[in-house]
A protein has these predicted regions:
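Short beta-strand immediately N-terminal to the Walker A/P-loop
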Residues: 37-38, 81
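Short helical segment in ABC ATPase nucleotide-binding domains corresponding to the A-loop/adjacent helical element
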Residues: 95-103, 116
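Helix-to-loop junction immediately C-terminal to a conserved catalytic motif
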Residues: 55
């Protein structure tokens, strides 16, 4: 059986004033379809970095990620991340904040009208249609 997720020799480093800071060094993980895996570790050990690479929000410095035998190079509609410390851009409306992500994920596959409909549909799913034009400080 092929792996559902294959993280293959993933390295990640970030530039700093003192040179590259290596945060991941040759990470390997294979997950079969239906299998559940937890990443456990202390703060700062790279768990979120691995998940951001799998989500397509970051590109590994070396190595790669395959999801259902397709290389992950950008965010996609088949993956989602719930951030620990989320924030909305205070100068944008609820609709505009959500639309940023929708445009990023679907810009190549959906028309402008389809992205508008998708944004409104998903805000309706979480009962936020009434707040489309409100700024984050106007909702609770």
């Amino acid at each position: 059986m092929n792996e559902y997720l294959n993280i293959d020799h993933v390295h990640m480093s970030f530039p700093t004033d003192k040179g590259p800071l290596e945060v991941l060094n040759s990470i390997n993980l294979k997950v079969k379809k239906g299998e559940f895996v937890s990443l456990i570790g202390h703060s700062g050990c790279g768990k979120s970095t691995v998940l951001n690479i799998v989500a397509g929000l970051l590109n590994a410095t070396q190595g790669g990620v395959l999801l259902e035998d397709k290389e992950v190079t950008e965010p996609g509609p088949d993956r989602a991340v719930v951030f620990q410390n989320h924030s909305l851009l205070p100068w944008l409306t609820v609709y505009e904040n959500v639309r940023l992500a929708v445009d990023q994920v679907f810009k190549k596959t959906k028309s402008k009208q389809e992205r508008d409909e998708w944004t409104r549909h998903n805000l309706e799913l979480v009962h936020m249609s009434h707040a489309l034009d409100r700024k984050p400080d106007e909702i609770s």
